[in-house]
Amino acid sequence: PKSMDDLNSFVTKEIGDVQLLFNNAGVAPAELQSIWDTKPNDWNWAYGVNVMGVVHGIQAFVPSMLAHDKDARVINTCSGNGAFINLPSTPIYTSSKAAVSSITEVLKLQLEQMQSKIKVSILFPGPHTVRTNLFSAERNRPEELARDPNAPEHPISSVEDMVEMMKTLG
């Protein structure tokens, strides 16, 4: 989108050629339900941020990184949930982070085929849940992607709650 293109123009003008692109986007909708009980707005919001945020970063910055032909790196933040394990309690978040993992691998292969100087990495924070605002991301949710008011409340409100839930997985 234009906002990412504008960011690239601003950074290039103020700092110079971009040599490090760090795509770090993540929201976790209130889930803990079966896939068939989830709502389209939950999918649209999470995929819009978690997946398309990474895609938009790549689309806005990689072409200019290729053009200046310098050593550079793209780092995409992922999650072990979706890349290494698939928690059944978070189908939307899990599948969105699996998509980020796949996008990162494809980007790496495409740039290698071009013999580009851009290297691609994936970051998996952890190995445990990192204390972030991921579980309170609803505060930034766009109104047009509002949560279903009839959906059950999210029983996980803190990292400690997540740890307790994980203990039950066996």
Describe the function of each predicted region.
Residues 75-99, 105, 109-113, 126-129, ...:
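Catalytic loop of short-chain dehydrogenase/reductase
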Residues 17-18, 65-79, 115-119:
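Active-site loop of short-chain dehydrogenase/reductase
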Residues 25-30:
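Conserved NAD(P)H cofactor-binding loop of Rossmann-fold oxidoreductase domains
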Residues 2-16:
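Conserved amphipathic alpha-helix within the SDR
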Residues 113-170:
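SDR active-site lid
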Residues 58-59:
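A short, exposed helix-loop element centered on a Lys and neighboring polar residues
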Residues 32-35, 39-45:
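Substrate-binding pocket helix/loop in short-chain dehydrogenase/reductase
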